[in-house]
């Protein structure tokens, strides 16, 4: 697409960054001075009843700056990158039709990638998912997994022999990663985002600062009632650690503590470590991201001014 045709597209803003980098605070400030509406890009904030451990914006923040795509799933439900892309495009179209600019804020980089580039027909292999499938096969046999595929994707099951573990495993893996069947995905192709996107990433200047912020925020969550929040989820009886919601950083570690598998101190240590690892993965994504402008989270006023310099002209 050439620059002229790109300039005629509706505008959108991405505000990305690692966990605990101050994205939400900056987005709320930007909404005060720009004609923007916020869309959450976070695979944990979609879940109802998971507020403290996800650092979900509080009632006052949401009153000042409503976020779309919050609290749209029960923790027992799955939500894929394909689901997000569909929902986000719908919200962006609504916002644009109202004469405003979508501001997408969050740290789930896979969602940003899916939205920006479209979904590639098949997701990349996931060693963790593949390992779970192989473990299931060792316990139940490949014939049982073929029957499972028969229920999920009968078209693929008819094509794949029960004695072909590689193809059988891949078909199941694709479904578990994307929430879509192999048959569905091979019938579709990705479409690039039909918007002129201004992309920003906010992060502290050093890894040490980010680690300090992560540790501080984890302790703030604990002081705010995080344990009680997870105990309420645990008490439901229908949730478990195979669900994406309970595998969220912090929740998985608190769950292990509640089940008596680890001590409280070990839970805190593992929770902080897991959050740091998440931030590291997010930063790896962002360092390889094309066309992103970096903002310093330790200087929020300057970060706001830098966004306004770039975006202010498009808001006139």
UniProtKB/Swiss-Prot annotation:
| Chain positions of site Interaction with substrate tRNA | 108, 130
Name the positions where substrate binds.
Answer: 19-24
Q: Which reaction does it catalyse?
A: adenosine(37) in tRNA + dimethylallyl diphosphate = N(6)-dimethylallyladenosine(37) in tRNA + diphosphate
Q: What's a Pfam family this protein contains?
A: IPPT
Name the coenzymes or cofactors required. Answer: Mg(2+)
- Please give the Gene3D superfamilies that the UniProt record associates with this protein: 1.10.20.140, Crystal structure of tRNA isopentenylpyrophosphate transferase (bh2366) domain (1.10.287.890), P-loop containing nucleotide triphosphate hydrolases (3.40.50.300)
Which branch of life, at top level? Bacteria
Q: Single Gene Ontology BP term?
A: tRNA modification
Quote the EC number: 2.5.1.75
Q: Which GO terms describe its molecular function?
A: ATP binding; tRNA dimethylallyltransferase activity
Q: Does the keyword Lipid metabolism apply?
A: no
- Please provide the record's keywords in A-Z order: ATP-binding, Magnesium, Nucleotide-binding, Transferase, tRNA processing
Q: Where is the signal peptide?
A: none
* UniProt family annotation: Belongs to the IPP transferase family.
Q: Which NCBIfam families match?
A: miaA
What this protein is reported to do is described as:
Catalyzes the transfer of a dimethylallyl group onto the adenine at position 37 in tRNAs that read codons beginning with uridine, leading to the formation of N6-(dimethylallyl)adenosine (i(6)A).
Q: What subunit structure does UniProt give?
A: Monomer.
What name does this protein carry? Answer: tRNA dimethylallyltransferase
- Give the classification, highest ranks: Bacteria, Pseudomonadati, Pseudomonadota, Gammaproteobacteria, Enterobacterales
């Amino acid at each position: 697409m050439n620059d002229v045709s790109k300039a005629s597209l509706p505008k959108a803003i991405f505000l990305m960054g690692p966990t605990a980098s101050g994205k939400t605070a900056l987005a709320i400030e930007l909404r005060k001075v720009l004609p923007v509406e916020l869309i959450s890009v976070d695979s944990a904030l979609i879940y109802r009843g998971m507020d403290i451990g996800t650092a979900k914006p509080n009632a006052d923040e949401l009153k000042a700056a409503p976020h779309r795509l919050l609290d749209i799933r029960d923790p027992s439900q799955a939500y894929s990158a394909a689901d997000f892309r569909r929902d986000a495009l719908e919200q962006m179209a609504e916002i644009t039709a109202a004469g405003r600019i979508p501001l997408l804020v969050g740290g789930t980089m896979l969602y940003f990638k899916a939205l920006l580039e479209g979904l590639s027909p098949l997701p990349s292999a996931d060693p963790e998912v593949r390992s779970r499938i192989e473990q299931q096969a060792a316990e139940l046999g490949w014939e049982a997994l073929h029957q499972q595929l028969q229920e999920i994707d009968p078209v693929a099951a008819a094509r794949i022999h029960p004695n072909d573990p590689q193809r059988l495993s891949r078909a199941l893996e694709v479904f578990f990663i994307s929430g879509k069947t192999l048959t569905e995905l091979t019938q579709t192709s990705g479409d690039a985002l039909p918007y002129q996107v201004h992309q920003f990433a906010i992060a502290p200047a050093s890894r040490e600062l980010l680690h300090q912020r992560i540790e501080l925020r984890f302790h703030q969550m604990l002081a705010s009632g995080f344990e009680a929040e997870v105990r309420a989820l645990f008490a439901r009886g229908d949730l478990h650690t195979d669900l994406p919601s309970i595998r969220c950083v912090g929740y998985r570690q608190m769950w292990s503590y509640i089940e008596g598998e680890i001590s409280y101190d070990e839970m805190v240590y593992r929770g902080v470590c897991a959050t740091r690892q998440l931030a590291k993965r997010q930063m790896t994504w962002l360092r390889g991201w094309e066309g992103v402008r970096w903002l310093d989270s330790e200087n929020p006023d300057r970060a706001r001014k830098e966004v306004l310099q770039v975006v202010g002209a498009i808001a006139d």
